[in-house]
Amino acid sequence: MSTMTTIARPYAKAAFDFAVEKNELNQWVQMLTFCSEVTKNKDMAQLLDGAVAPEKLAEIFISICGEQLNEFGQNLIHIMAENGRLKVLPDVLDQYILLQHEFEKVIDAEIISAIELTEQQKADIGAKLEARLERKVKLNCSVDEALLAGVIIRAGDLVIDNSVRGRLSRLSETLQS
């Protein structure tokens, strides 16, 4: 686990708890997403690395974000600037989204297939994963022709490799041992 993730977690948890209390989960995702993008800007990154006073940095950051931040979002920016932590806003966003998915019982599932899946196949895979994981599943589908045939499914800690390439690899390992 990276240091940035460890630093970001308390800020994400505080923002998330506040958002739950105020019933503003999606509004906070939008604010954190916007702030995350601002920190990725080349000029802003240089400013964050510079020797700007925290209060001045917070003012600049908030003025750039404008109406994208409500007063509570601005408070978060002030606190993070005081602690020299504005650079971790992308990690705060990532941690916040993980907390939101856990709260809403949603999990992202990556489906890699050898060919493009039909809508019916996607629906079937999604339904079976939801039943198995007892969560709502958001599918992210991609194609990798190197699989030859079949699919690889990754959802949280669950990995199901039902591809021909995976089967051939396991067969090769078995024969070599």
From Swiss-Prot:
Location in the cell reads: Cell inner membrane
Check the record and name the PANTHER family matching this protein. Answer: ATP SYNTHASE DELTA CHAIN (PTHR11910)
Please provide, alphabetically and separated by semicolons, the GO molecular function terms listed in this UniProt record.
proton-transporting ATP synthase activity, rotational mechanism
Q: List residues traversing the bilayer.
A: none
Specify the protein name.
ATP synthase subunit delta
Q: Which InterPro entries match?
A: ATP_synth_OSCP/delta_N_sf, ATPase_OSCP/d_CS, ATPase_OSCP/dsu
Described function: F(1)F(0) ATP synthase produces ATP from ADP in the presence of a proton or sodium gradient. F-type ATPases consist of two structural domains, F(1) containing the extramembraneous catalytic core and F(0) containing the membrane proton channel, linked together by a central stalk and a peripheral stalk. During catalysis, ATP synthesis in the catalytic domain of F(1) is coupled via a rotary mechanism of the central stalk subunits to proton translocation.
Give GO cellular component annotations, separated by semicolons: plasma membrane; proton-transporting ATP synthase complex
Task: Give the chief site where it resides.
Answer: membrane
Q: How does it sit in the membrane?
A: Peripheral membrane protein
Species this chain originates from: Aliivibrio salmonicida (strain LFI1238) (Vibrio salmonicida (strain LFI1238))
Q: Which SUPFAM superfamilies match?
A: N-terminal domain of the delta subunit of the F1F0-ATP synthase
Q: Which UniProt keywords apply?
A: ATP synthesis, Cell inner membrane, Cell membrane, CF(1), Hydrogen ion transport, Ion transport, Membrane, Transport
> So what family is this one in?
Belongs to the ATPase delta chain family.
Pfam family membership, one = OSCP
Q: How does it assemble?
A: F-type ATPases have 2 components, F(1) - the catalytic core - and F(0) - the membrane proton channel. F(1) has five subunits: alpha(3), beta(3), gamma(1), delta(1), epsilon(1). F(0) has three main subunits: a(1), b(2) and c(10-14). The alpha and beta chains form an alternating ring which encloses part of the gamma chain. F(1) is attached to F(0) by a central stalk formed by the gamma and epsilon chains, while a peripheral stalk is formed by the delta and b chains.
Database matches in Gene3D superfamilies? N-terminal domain of the delta subunit of the F1F0-ATP synthase
